[in-house]
């Protein structure tokens, strides 16, 4: 391990996180059923179901999720003693996530795309057992284009949804972004969020499917079609492959099938491409947004319904009332074979909205650097 990294490790203070990202208040996490930990009011409480941590260990993975309302990137893993590890850092309006192996993590945020790289050599660990240290190595300034989902193409280059401009985009070395594709119903690029294009699924390293809240071509026209105007569109053919959805998000291509969240109805399901039909697999007791797949499992992000017009009057309201449950914030693990929720994690307090969820394969206990403390000044590694 490089000497500079050794020096940093000696100064790392185990288990210390704060609401603003500084390492000066201890947040005492966590047991397999996590205990509440103190933060500035209102507090944050994370509770995992009994086998959640065991599932992480069995699948040999960790999880990352973004909470754009509070501007937090959370990393969940397993401590050596079998307890849940929770790590967080602050990035304003953090949104979409994309992963490449165990080394690279991409994230969209308020006006930048961030590429994180793991600074720990293979087999090394920071004090406390962290086996991965994601360092924000590259920041790409896009301006506030309301970037949502981000994904990586076959060359490992990012493709993202520029929601404000209703298009798919790539980074530019000289401009805010380079437009790649826009839906056939959008007549021109304009900073008008015409259809609330938000989700992106890749297939064979290419953009394959997107979700939009409507097929409108006027300034914020989607707001009038939140209940049933949502669509899934094939990027290659420009054909709509599913209609009648309520604020769909997070399309994902997995094992030869297209999965999507029908967020406004609280449904997770797949799209029958031959029939052009959405088929629900599981009910989500919250506004579902953020989806990542591994093997026979889906990890889904849940948000409580915001107290504004955008999230009011949706089919989800009726479904929750019919089932006599309140909306939840957290994560669900769904078995794709049965549609059953097999594990869960609930979040209460200051965090009420999640945007994206990513699986970190081969990572046991992840950590990251942010910009609110001087840790990033002391983390120096040399390329060999």
Residues covered by each model-derived region:
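Sequence-structural signature of mature extracellular/luminal beta-sheet repeat domains
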Residues: 5-384
């Amino acid at each position: 391990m490089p000497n500079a990294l050794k020096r940093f490790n000696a100064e790392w203070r185990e288990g210390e996180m704060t609401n603003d990202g500084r390492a000066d208040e201890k947040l005492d996490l966590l047991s397999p059923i996590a205990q509440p930990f103190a933060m500035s009011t209102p507090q944050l409480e994370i509770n995992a179901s009994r086998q959640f941590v065991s599932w992480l260990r069995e699948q040999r993975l960790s999880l990352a999720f973004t909470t754009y309302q509070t501007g937090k990137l959370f990393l969940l893993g397993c401590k050596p003693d079998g307890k849940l590890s929770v790590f967080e850092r602050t990035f304003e309006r953090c949104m979409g996530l994309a992963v490449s192996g165990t080394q690279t993590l991409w994230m969209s945020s308020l006006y930048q795309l961030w590429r994180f790289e793991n600074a720990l050599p293979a087999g090394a660990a920071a004090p406390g057992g962290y086996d991965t240290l994601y360092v924000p190595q590259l920041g790409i300034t896009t301006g506030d284009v309301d970037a949502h989902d981000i994904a990586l193409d076959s060359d490992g280059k990012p493709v993202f949804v520029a929601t404000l401009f209703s298009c798919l985009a790539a980074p530019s070395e000289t401009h805010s972004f380079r437009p790649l594709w826009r839906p056939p119903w959008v007549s021109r690029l304009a900073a008008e969020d015409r259809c609330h294009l938000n989700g992106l699924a890749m297939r064979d390293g290419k953009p394959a499917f997107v979700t939009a809240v409507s097929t409108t071509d006027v300034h914020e026209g989607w707001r009038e079609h939140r209940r049933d105007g949502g669509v899934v569109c094939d990027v290659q053919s420009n054909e709509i492959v599913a209609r009648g959805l309520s604020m769909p998000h997070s399309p994902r291509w997995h094992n030869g099938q297209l999965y999507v969240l029908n967020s406004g109805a609280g449904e997770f399901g797949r799209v029958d491409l031959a029939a052009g039909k959405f088929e629900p697999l599981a009910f989500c007791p919250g506004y579902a947004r953020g989806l990542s797949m591994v093997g026979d499992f889906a990890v889904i992000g849940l948000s409580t319904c915001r107290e504004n017009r955008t999230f009011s009057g949706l089919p989800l309201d009726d479904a929750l009332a019919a089932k006599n449950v309140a909306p939840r914030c957290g994560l669900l693990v769904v078995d794709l074979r049965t549609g059953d929720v097999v594990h869960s994690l609930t979040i209460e307090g200051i965090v009420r909205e999640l945007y994206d969820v990513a699986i970190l394969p081969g990572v046991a206990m992840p950590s990251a650097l942010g910009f609110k403390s001087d840790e990033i000044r002391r983390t120096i590694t040399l390329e060999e």
